Amino acid sequence: MNFLAHLHLAHLADNSLSGNLLADFVRGNPATHYPPDVVEGIYMHRRIDVMTDNLPEAREAREWFRHETRRVAPITLDVMWDHFLSRHWTQISPDFPLQAFVGYAHAQVATILPDFPPRFVNLNDYLWSEKWLERYRDMDFIQNVLNGMANRRPRLDALRDSWYDLDAHYDALEERFWHFYPRMMAQAARKAL
C-alpha cells in the first residue's frame, strides 16, 4: 500500500493518519520519539505492509513482473494499489468523496508537521499541494511517480521499466485489488490490522 491506502485504512480503523503516513520515515522503535497515537499509527502501517506483501494476490502479482523488474515489484504494486483505490474511490467510499477525504487527511497530518523529520515535511509540501492522492487515478501520474522514485534512488532504477509490467497486467491487477482490498477495509473497521 502507498499513501492513499494507508490513510484510508487508518481512517477506517480510527487510527492516527499522521503515524500511518509518517511510518516510512521512521526506523527502529518510534516510542521514544513520538506520541503514543502516532506510534500506534506507525505500527499499524508496518503491519499493513507485512500483510500486503504476504497476500496471495500480491505474491501472485509479483510473479507477473519480468526478471529485470521483479526486485522492485513490491514497491510498484504498492503504488498501483493506490491507483485502483483512487480510481474506484466513489465505489469504495461513496459517502466520503475523495477530495473531501484528502482535505480531512491533510488537516489531520498538518497538525504534527512542524515537529517531524525534514524529509517527511518536504514530502507533505508536494503530496498535498500537487494533489498526488487524487492524481493516483491517472496512469500517466503513476508512471511519473515510479520515475521520480527511480530518480531519487538510483538502486531502484528498475522502477522505470516496471511500468510496462503494470500496463501488461492491468486488468488482472485490478481484479486482484478487488479480491483483497475490501477484506482489508473490513479488518480495519474491526480494528484488526
UniProtKB/Swiss-Prot annotation:
Reactions this protein catalyses: holo-[ACP] + H2O = apo-[ACP] + (R)-4'-phosphopantetheine + H(+)
Secreted is among the record's keywords: no
GO biological process terms, semicolon-separated: fatty acid biosynthetic process
Record bears the keyword Hydrolase: yes
Source superkingdom: Bacteria
A GO MF term: [acyl-carrier-protein] phosphodiesterase activity
Keywords: Fatty acid biosynthesis, Fatty acid metabolism, Hydrolase, Lipid biosynthesis, Lipid metabolism
EC number, UniProt record: 3.1.4.14
Cross-referenced HAMAP family: AcpH
Function: Converts holo-ACP to apo-ACP by hydrolytic cleavage of the phosphopantetheine prosthetic group from ACP.
Protein family according to the UniProt entry: Belongs to the AcpH family.
Name of the molecule in the record: Acyl carrier protein phosphodiesterase
Gene name of the encoded protein: acpH
